From Swiss-Prot:
GO term, biological process aspect, one: translation
Occurrences of domain S4 RNA-binding (ranges): 104-166
Family: Belongs to the universal ribosomal protein uS4 family.
Gene that this sequence comes from: rps4
Record's protein name: Small ribosomal subunit protein uS4
Species in which this protein is naturally found: Saccharolobus islandicus (strain L.S.2.15 / Lassen #1)
GO CC list: small ribosomal subunit
PANTHER family found in the cross-reference section: 30S 40S RIBOSOMAL PROTEIN, 40S RIBOSOMAL PROTEIN S9
Length: 181
C-alpha cells in the first residue's frame, strides 16, 4: 500500500492582486452567483483554462487524431452543458468563459428552477441537505450539473421544503426579510 495522494490546489490566484477592473468584475460575479469567496471564481477560471488549453493543443495534432480527440472533448463539454450544439468547434471551446461554468453549478440551477428565492438561499438549502439530484442528497453548491441531471433536481425526500416550498419574503414598511403569515 502506498502513501495517500498529495492534495493540490485546484485554482490559481491572479498574478497581480490589485487590478481595479478585475476586482469589480469578480465582485459582480460574487453577487450574481451567490458565491462565498473569490476562490470559487478562480476555480471556475482554472477549469475553463484547462479546457481551453486542451482545445489549443488539438490544433497541433495531425488531422485524423485531431478529429477523434476534438469529438471526445466536444462530447464531454456537451454532456456538462457548457456547449449547446453538437456541431461545436474548437473556436466555441476557446470562447468559453467562467460564467458559462458558473451557470452549471447546482447552486445557480436550484435558484433558476425556482426551488429557492435567491442564490444565497439556494446555497443554504444545498448545504443543509434539502436538495437532491436524481434522488441522492447533494451538499456541495459547486457541484457541476450535467445536462442529463438537470431535470432530476428536486427537494430531498425527507426535506421539510418538499411539502412547503420557501415563501417569497414580503416587504412591509420598508423592512426586508419580514415574512407575512
Amino acid at each position: 500500500m502506498g502513501d495517500p495522494k498529495k492534495s493540490r490546489k485546484k485554482w490559481e490566484s491572479p498574478g497581480h492582486p490589485w487590478i481595479k477592473e478585475r476586482i469589480g468584475y469578480e465582485q459582480e460575479l460574487l453577487g450574481k452567483y451567490g458565491l462565498r469567496n473569490k476562490r470559487e471564481i478562480w476555480i471556475a477560471q482554472s477549469i475553463i483554462r484547462k479546457f481551453r488549453h486542451q482545445a489549443r493543443s488539438l490544433l497541433a495534432l495531425p488531422p485524423a487524431e485531431r478529429a477523434v480527440r476534438e469529438k471526445q472533448l466536444v462530447g464531454k463539454l456537451l454532456k456538462m452543458g457548457l456547449l449547446k450544439r453538437e456541431t461545436a468547434t474548437v473556436d466555441d471551446i476557446l470562447s468559453l468563459t467562467e460564467q458559462d461554468l458558473l451557470e452549471r453549478r447546482l447552486q445557480t440551477i436550484v435558484y433558476k428552477k425556482g426551488l429557492a428565492n435567491t442564490t444565497y438561499q439556494a446555497r443554504q438549502l444545498i448545504i443543509h441537505g434539502h436538495i437532491a439530484v436524481n434522488g441522492k442528497r447533494v451538499t456541495s453548491p459547486g457541484y457541476i450539473v450535467n445536462v442529463d441531471e438537470e431535470n432530476l433536481i428536486d427537494y430531498y425526500v425527507t426535506s421539510s421544503f418538499k411539502s412547503r416550498p420557501p415563501v417569497m419574503a414580503q416587504q412591509e414598511g420598508g423592512e426586508a426579510g419580514v415574512k407575512q403569515a
